[in-house]
């Protein structure tokens, strides 16, 4: 749980956590801020202090919902820094980060980097920043010894959210079964009202519609695979494949809360009509 973060940081010799990227579909950020409409942000978690969230000026109200100490990027003149560095955006961005870090008195110690960013540009900025601030050790939590450990234990709110996703997911699975069993059989295939085959693509389209209607997202797609595809690990299924009787169907669905919060993973293996050896 979040209450463990300070102790885990101390155990692992970390002076700060730096989480960068958007406020959605960015698990480390969402864990602290909740699902927030932040297109780009930086969060600094320092033991004994309220977390510090840097945000774009247009997203100040969204950032305020976090309850954290706020810093607007607009407080720093990036254009002036770009001119100062003769157009070197990477170095200018590093200089802005240096100003931010000095302002929050984070100028030395071990800083663990988390988050979801385009790795190339961010890596270049971090290289510049490391040279500008040599007393900082910018590194990664390769063993995931802090956030993974903290997230292994859930509080009641987290459990309620996971249960809600479980109920939603199993509702969609029930709907899927009803969809399949409501279709007529022609030969060994399920057919639609116009006589055309019901396909994997038809079923997955309907799954996505249900998930959207019930308030979830499906960013990782769904595995709904039949026949040979069902025997290939993590084959998501061929959209044009018809749904046939007696063929193995692997159904693995793992949607998440809107904005990329908690997921729920549910798997079933089906065979319609009868099961072959």
Model-derived features: where do they sit?
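Active-site neighborhoods and metal-handling regions in enzymes and metal-associated proteins
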Residues: 1-277
């Amino acid at each position: 749980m979040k209450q463990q973060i300070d102790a885990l940081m101390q155990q692992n010799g970390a002076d700060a956590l730096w989480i960068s990227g958007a406020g959605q579909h960015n698990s480390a950020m969402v864990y602290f801020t909740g699902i927030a409409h932040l297109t780009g942000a930086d969060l600094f978690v320092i033991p004994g202090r309220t977390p510090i969230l840097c945000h774009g000026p247009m997203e100040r109200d969204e950032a305020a919902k976090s309850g954290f100490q706020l810093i607007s990027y607009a407080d720093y003149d990036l254009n002036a820094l770009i001119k100062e560095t003769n157009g070197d955006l990477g170095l200018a961005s590093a200089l802005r980060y240096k100003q931010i870090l000095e302002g929050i008195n984070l100028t030395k110690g071990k800083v663990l980097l988390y988050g979801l960013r385009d790795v190339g540009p961010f890596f270049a900025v971090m290289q510049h920043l490391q040279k500008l601030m040599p007393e900082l050790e910018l590194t990664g939590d390769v063993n995931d010894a802090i956030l993974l450990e903290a997230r292994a234990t859930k509080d009641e709110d987290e459990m309620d959210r996971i249960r809600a996703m479980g109920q939603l997911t199993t509702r969609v699975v029930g709907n899927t079964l009803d969809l399949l069993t409501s279709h007529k059989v022609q030969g060994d295939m399920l057919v639609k009202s116009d006589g055309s085959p019901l396909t994997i693509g038809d079923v997955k389209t309907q799954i996505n519609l249900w998930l959207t209607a019930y308030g979830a997202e499906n960013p990782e797609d769904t595995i709904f695979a039949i026949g040979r595809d069902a025997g290939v690990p993590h084959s998501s299924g061929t959209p044009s494949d018809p749904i046939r009787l007696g063929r193995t169907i692997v159904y693995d669905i793992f949607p998440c809360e809107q904005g990329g919060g908690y997921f729920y993973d549910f798997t079933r293996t089906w065979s319609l009509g009868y099961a072959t050896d």
